[in-house]
Swiss-Prot record:
It is a single-pass type I membrane protein. One of its GO terms (cellular component) is membrane. This is Transmembrane protein 89. Residues 87-159 are cytoplasmic. It comes from the Eukaryota. Keywords: Membrane, Signal, Transmembrane, Transmembrane helix. The chain crosses the membrane at residues 64-86. InterPro entries: TMEM89. Residues 25-63 are extracellular. It comes from Homo sapiens (Human). The keyword Transmembrane helix applies. It is found in: Membrane. Residues 91-110 are annotated as: Disordered. Residues 1-24 form the signal peptide.
Length: 159
């Protein structure tokens, strides 16, 4: 439980938005890295048409946008917390000498059901992350077609 409390300030830093004067672009712009998967960086601010890479898009005044990376980090953190809780339950049952009872009734009480395996839990989280990435990709493609922004890897050859 102490690990969870220690990670709360980090989660709060990820969720809260910074001032627009301090960070007008995501962190990878500040350090000069090209980590954007959609790659729509304008040559200059004047050529910016309000796209994803424009200053102020990610952290605008009053905006509460959250980075997709932060969403994945929060999901991963929650998965780790759930895993620790499940491990603690299993350890406490093992020290008491109790074994989980398995019932064939689908509507039996929750305590009588077999515990969910780590494989099943991990599979569910991976499906959730996959759905999140598909949603982000669809949103970025929609923005690219809406604003005529060229996506990295696609070429517009004429002739």
């Amino acid at each position: 439980m102490l690990h969870v409390l220690a990670s709360l300030p980090l989660l709060l830093l990820l969720v809260t938005s910074a001032s627009t004067h301090a960070w007008s672009r995501p962190l990878w712009y500040q350090v000069g890295l090209d980590l954007q998967p959609w790659g729509c960086q304008p040559k200059s601010v004047e050529g910016c048409r309000g796209g994803l890479s424009c200053p102020g898009y990610w952290l605008g005044p009053g905006a509460s946008r959250i980075y997709p990376v932060a969403a994945v980090m929060i999901t991963t953190t929650m998965l780790m917390i759930c895993r620790k809780i499940l491990q603690g339950r299993r350890r406490s049952q093992a020290t008491k000498g109790e074994h989980p009872q398995v019932t064939t009734e689908p509507c039996g009480p929750w305590k009588r059901r077999a515990p969910i395996s780590d494989h099943t839990l991990l599979r569910g989280v991976l499906h959730m992350l996959d759905a999140l990435l598909v949603h982000i990709e669809g949103h970025l493609r929609h923005l690219a077609t809406q604003r005529q922004i060229q996506i990295k890897g696609t070429s517009t050859q004429s002739g």
